[in-house]
């Protein structure tokens, strides 16, 4: 059974890595892999509790998926109402080096609240308006991708992996920001400083200045600003909600989406002269959410959960403990692998291999110094968050932003 499950996972992940050559969406492969792994585990595992384990794992995975669906809807709603124009339209500098620094810093902080792919798309759209040279665009785009990945690494809502670690209780929002903000910022400053050497200290000459994006029909600046404030405020509300109530973050995100949904419905109900077809209601925006990505996360996370239920991840963790026994090396290898392999299954696998160590387990451990790294907010979780996030910048295929 173990060999069969390993072969299914390796073959499935190989197909995911080659999705562009195979011309098969990775979500379809992930769902098939998930179904195959759980079927093999059920038929050959001889475990009467397999149904219960499946429900428990699906519950944990669904929390992450509901969080992502709500967050993606909020971001899409802001974008549909031109909310991000408030940020991009205030960039007035034309000096290329100043523009590079400005774009990298804005991207860094935006991706801490939004997901890194959305942030990258917004900044690349702005870049195309301001920089005409193809080679210079590549340099600017590379810095933007690095800044987006680094910005998502220090925020509990900035990347799927940080969301996973935060929601499962591996890290807390306050210490995550406190420990990783400076390392993440340095990981942006150094590449930007190097890239500046390849950018001439001169003003940009955009080819088309009339291509600046305009607000959607019947959406005024005031309405656009309100949607932006409510949306971003709702995203920032989630960590506060979890800290105050102790309830799961996905519930706070659902509340934020509900508030924004009610607000936009009330506004559109008062726009009697506006055609229904051009109203960006949430029910319409939901049709444009990237559901294949959500289904990919469902398939890949449940596939890793199957390996965990089979005991494979625990066995691999024991192997690393005996032969490596060094959290810096394990996290570093994970970071390097994230340049080639999607960081979501990598982080999910590490979470399955190393459960959060509580006080009782730490006290009874034969090596409490080593196990201290795996407590909540332990050094391993912060290293894993940073390495998996920033490591995706090493290659263009290493992250969704790239």
Question: Residues of each region from the PLM?
Answer:
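Short, amphipathic, aromatic/basic-enriched membrane-interface segments that mark the entry/exit
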Residues: 1-3, 89-95, 215-227, 373-374
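Hydrophobic transmembrane alpha-helices of multi-pass solute/ion transporters
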Residues: 5-77, 86-94, 250-302, 312-324
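Hydrophobic alpha-helical transmembrane segments
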Residues: 6, 31-32, 65, 100-105, ...
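Alpha-helical transmembrane segments of multipass membrane proteins
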Residues: 13-17, 35-39, 108-109, 193, ...
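Membrane-interfacial helix-loop connectors
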Residues: 37-47, 58-59, 110-147, 151, ...
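Transmembrane helical segments that form the transport core of multi-pass membrane transport proteins
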Residues: 81, 103, 234, 238-376
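Flexible loop linkers connecting adjacent transmembrane helices
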Residues: 81-92, 205-212
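Core mid-bundle transmembrane helix pairs that form the ion/substrate translocation pathway
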Residues: 176-264
